[in-house]
Amino acid sequence: MAWKCWLYDTITGLADVPLDVPQFSWSLSISDSTLSTTRDKGTGDEGGSGLTLPWSAFPAGSREARARMLAPTRRAMVLAWDDGSDMGVPIIWGAIGEPTIGWEDVSFDLSSPLTLLGSRYAVREGAFGTGAGSTSTDVIRYSGMSLRGILASLGELCTKAKPGGMLPIDWRYAGEAGRHERTYSAYDVANRSWKQLATNIANVNGGPDFQFRPHWADSQHVRLSFEAGSDSEPYLAQSGIIPTLTCFAGGGTIEDMSVACLGPAMRVYGTGSGSDEATLCHLSQDLALCTQADPWPLVEVTASSSDWDSANLVKSHADSVLAASKTPLVQLTGKVSLSDEGGITLGQVWPGQLVDVDIRDHPWLPDGTYRMRLMSMAGDQSDMATLTFDQIPDPWSDHTVYR
């Protein structure tokens, strides 16, 4: 069996019992993850939303014990790659959502760490609605900090600083020094979930990638390590030697390689907070491709958010969109066996990290080794996984993307 599944306590991370999940699908991206069951329905597509498990999957001796195991958000699951150890290597973490109980089985969704933190808000205890006339005047200010330091400090505020808010997350960058500042007003609570604030920070120009990685703290407890890129290197750090995959006609360690192509966008109209003529605006553009010998036609896009409350923030977001789209791009996907030696090792290689792909005799791509960032992994109960890599410049326009 390639995988193991465990039930455990959401708050403490204490492992309870193993679960038998015969068929499932999973996915792992830079900042989020999913796990769902797959079932043969006879007709139509195979697939399911969330998990549907037979009662036999739960080692419970009574209905009361089943109820305790399925308490929504109080219990969680971890999917671990079976590496031969007793517990396996934890890969996917999720809190049990609201179950639907049937005679033969039970269905529920899993809430990833990011989803769970979508219902935690950056508001200090005792500071909401306590101003004159039931107003909220409290303002949270962070200054002289790194972006991941702000994220981790917000994480501590949204977890350990709240009653019943503890989660098994290690916020290891809290208070880290840097050159950034952020201000959050309590009255704007609807836009102050940790998930929303983290998404906003990650999407600014130079914003850090971040990820929650499960690991066994000891033989009984699973915890989540909050990993994030730094101000100087926003990408996630490598956890070992950069792996090399091979792809050539009729073989290789990565199979079914496909290439998606995307044209450039040369202008970004950015808008932020404000209304009508007072709306904050910024135009980011790079018209080099429109003025070359064999020009590209102009493509314009927009980017907007009412949360962008300063001219610099609007500029940063518009510049970020332009930087990601101003050249023609390609994106590679392929399948790998997780059991192949020298390939992708789960628990050592994570989305957001670098992978070398050596490509030969492809019908379109030039021969060479392409160093790309892994964006997502997805698979099922087998040892096969689909890898999706970050977009890179079209190699026929930029020969530096391979060697």
Kindly give the residue locations of the regions a language model identified.
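Polar/acidic, low-complexity leader/linker segments enriched in S/T/G and N/D
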Residues: 1-28
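A generic structural signal for beta-strand entry/edge sites
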Residues: 2, 46-50, 102-109, 219-223, ...
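Short conserved beta-strand and strand-loop elements enriched in small hydrophobics
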Residues: 5, 73-83, 353-361
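An acidic/polar, Gly/Ser/Thr-rich interaction patch typically located in mid-to-C-terminal regions
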Residues: 38-69, 247-403
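Surface-exposed cap/loop segments at beta↔alpha junctions
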Residues: 64-173
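Short beta-strand-centered interaction patches in the first periplasmic/extracellular domains
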Residues: 101-117, 169-264
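Extracytoplasmic/secreted envelope proteins and their assembly/folding machinery
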Residues: 151, 195-198, 267-268, 315
